[in-house]
Amino acid sequence: MKSLSFLNHEFEAFPSPELALTDPNGLLAIGGDLRPERLLTAYYNGIFPWFNADDPILWWSPDPRAIFMLGKIRISTSLCKYLKKQPWHFTINHAFTSVMAGCAEPRPKQNGTWITDEIQMAYRELHQNGHAHSIEVWEGEQLIGGLYGLAIGQVFCGESMFHRQTNASKAAIVVLQQHLIKRGFKLIDAQVMNPHLESLGAKAIKRTHFIELLTQFRDKKVHPDAWIPSEVFLEL
């Protein structure tokens, strides 16, 4: 039976994702906190927080789930030509806080942001502890795009991306894919499908299939230098 769980500030196990509501799709639990231990446990089990500034903490595990299988991100001929012309350079874990702030900037036709100060503080702590990571896109010394997310074994859980110049966020995800393949990752969890993700090659799969993949890869190791702050190169 589908049911909604209420969490308190005592650390406790999450309910099974299979108990998540169908309307709204994937809502599993309310409450708790954003301590690193709770967040890591959530992602380890295919659950993530998503809530507005005035809401309690909401925990989700939607069905279907959007994922990118590595090597399957779609790079159109026109995008490839465009990116080759840009004087951009790319880094890993050089400006995590600035990337989160960029992702939190208001979007067209969007009121506010779910990347609240509380969320930013929690994920900065995860970054300091070696769990959350960023890709940066630069033009000179100006940050023009990027993305951030969490690494759970061989799975990268993408959280958000942003751009201040056309196609900069697409460049970030292409760089991310290239980096993850080289370091032994298997897939990107993109959480909820939308037209932008679909245009890049994301697939919507059943939650049960996603949990199977997550269980298969979440305890496996990747290359030890995967997240050392460094410059990376776009290969087209």
From Swiss-Prot:
InterPro entries with a match to the protein in the record: Acyl_CoA_acyltransferase, Leu/Phe-tRNA_Trfase, Leu/Phe-tRNA_Trfase_C, Leu/Phe-tRNA_Trfase_N
A cellular component term, taken from the record's GO annotations: cytoplasm
Disulfide-linked positions: none
Subcellular locations according to the entry: Cytoplasm
Keyword Secreted carried by entry: no
Keyword Ubl conjugation tagged: no
Swiss-Prot/TrEMBL GO biological process terms: protein catabolic process
Keywords: Acyltransferase, Cytoplasm, Transferase
EC code: 2.3.2.6
Catalysed transformations (reactions): N-terminal L-lysyl-[protein] + L-leucyl-tRNA(Leu) = N-terminal L-leucyl-L-lysyl-[protein] + tRNA(Leu) + H(+); N-terminal L-arginyl-[protein] + L-leucyl-tRNA(Leu) = N-terminal L-leucyl-L-arginyl-[protein] + tRNA(Leu) + H(+); L-phenylalanyl-tRNA(Phe) + an N-terminal L-alpha-aminoacyl-[protein] = an N-terminal L-phenylalanyl-L-alpha-aminoacyl-[protein] + tRNA(Phe)
A Pfam cross-reference name: Leu_Phe_trans
A single MF term (Gene Ontology): leucyl-tRNA--protein transferase activity
Similarity section: Belongs to the L/F-transferase family.
Full protein name: Leucyl/phenylalanyl-tRNA--protein transferase
Biological source species: Shewanella sp. (strain W3-18-1)
Taxonomic lineage: Bacteria, Pseudomonadati, Pseudomonadota, Gammaproteobacteria, Alteromonadales
